[in-house]
Amino acid sequence: MKNVHNTIDEARLGIMLNDLRLPTIKTLWPQFAEQADREGWPAARFLSAIAEHELAERAHRRIERHLAEAHLPPGKTLESFAFDAVPMVSKAQVMAIAAGDSWLAKGANILLFGPPGGGKSHLAAAIGLALIENGWRVLFTRTTDLVQKLQVARRELQLESAIAKLDKFDLLILDDLAYVTKDQAETSVLFELISARYERRSIMITANQPFGEWNRVFPDPAMTLAAVDRLVHHATIFEMNVESYRRRSAMEAKRHRGRPAAFATTKSASLIVAERQSEHDETLASDNQHDTFMPTAT
């Protein structure tokens, strides 16, 4: 009879845990209850143990959801970023930024400038990934893609609503700002986005052109000045003026392609010469020894 009551109680408990949306506790409580009985845990320790696992699993699922919605390019991490190739970027400063905290709470911005291939997008995505792992929400998008979506929203009289929906992201990463066409319709929705997030939600921008060339993006000088003013206020700026990583890799591969075997060895040229000279000397010595003991003809 006792087993029947236990079975009914366990079934009811499972239903209640489902209603309370506690799937991890529902899965783990039997094994923790057995351990608690075996080791004589007080009730508080038992409840604390299963609650801790529930919270940890919720945090894990939340990070997975945030990673899925962020659309980050794969494989871009701070661990794989070549800080030594971009000496003007402080690794310590980047690590502090990747923690989030105060600058995101203030709606501050991060601006990354430099020629194509210098690692701007990699660094932006890597910071975004670290922020998600620290509990923040991030969206990574090509600037042109987002601008086109906002233009559609404007035509449907939904621009304000579309911009408001982006407020759920603590950080909006706009990649390749320079590729926005110099068109009043496109740049105006971009300006409205920048204005709406000013001092409220953070923006990170990667761009090939410095501010002095932003008249190529914003056709209206007054709009250019206003956009720059809002972005620079409370901003951290990285000037990544280095040679393209892709170009460096291609040139390195070209230098190594088709080299003779001698150039592929790890031995130095002087060591190779010395070894060849030694082999030559040994050959001469062997020939001399052979000549000495050769019997003379009669």
Swiss-Prot record:
<comment type="similarity">
    <text>Belongs to the IS21/IS1162 putative ATP-binding protein family.</text>
</comment>
<keyword id="KW-0614">Plasmid</keyword>
<protein>
    <recommendedName>
        <fullName>Putative insertion sequence ATP-binding protein y4iQ/y4nD/y4sD</fullName>
    </recommendedName>
</protein>
<dbReference type="GO" id="GO:0005524">
    <property type="term" value="F:ATP binding"/>
</dbReference>
<keyword id="KW-0547">Nucleotide-binding</keyword>
<dbReference type="Pfam" id="PF01695">
    <property type="entry name" value="IstB_IS21"/>
</dbReference>
<dbReference type="InterPro" id="IPR047661">
    <property type="entry name" value="IstB"/>
</dbReference>
<dbReference type="InterPro" id="IPR002611">
    <property type="entry name" value="IstB_ATP-bd"/>
</dbReference>
<dbReference type="GO" id="GO:0016887">
    <property type="term" value="F:ATP hydrolysis activity"/>
</dbReference>
<dbReference type="InterPro" id="IPR027417">
    <property type="entry name" value="P-loop_NTPase"/>
</dbReference>
<dbReference type="GO" id="GO:0006260">
    <property type="term" value="P:DNA replication"/>
</dbReference>
<dbReference type="InterPro" id="IPR028350">
    <property type="entry name" value="DNAC/IstB-like"/>
</dbReference>
<keyword id="KW-0814">Transposable element</keyword>
<keyword id="KW-0067">ATP-binding</keyword>
<feature type="region of interest" description="Disordered">
    <location>
        <begin position="276"/>
        <end position="298"/>
    </location>
</feature>
<dbReference type="InterPro" id="IPR003593">
    <property type="entry name" value="AAA+_ATPase"/>
</dbReference>
<feature type="binding site">
    <location>
        <begin position="114"/>
        <end position="121"/>
    </location>
    <ligand>
        <name>ATP</name>
    </ligand>
</feature>
